[in-house]
Amino acid sequence: GILSLVKGAAKLLGKGLAKEGGKVGLEFIACKVTNQC
């Protein structure tokens, strides 16, 4: 169902973020927190 699709997408995103490294993730979190996205 939809939940399994969401879980699969989340896993792929997690792997992608891990490959890109923590820097990109931290920048994204920072811009979200400061509403600069």
UniProtKB/Swiss-Prot annotation:
Tissue specificity: Expressed by the skin glands.
GO cellular component: extracellular region
Record-annotated disulphide pairs: 31-37
Keyword annotations from UniProtKB, A to Z: Amphibian defense peptide, Antibiotic, Antimicrobial, Disulfide bond, Secreted
Domain of life: Eukaryota
Gene Ontology biological-process entries: defense response to bacterium
InterPro entries per UniProt: Antimicrobial_frog_2
Purpose: Antimicrobial peptide.
Family affiliation: Belongs to the frog skin active peptide (FSAP) family. Esculentin subfamily.
Name this protein carries in UniProt: Esculentin-2Ra
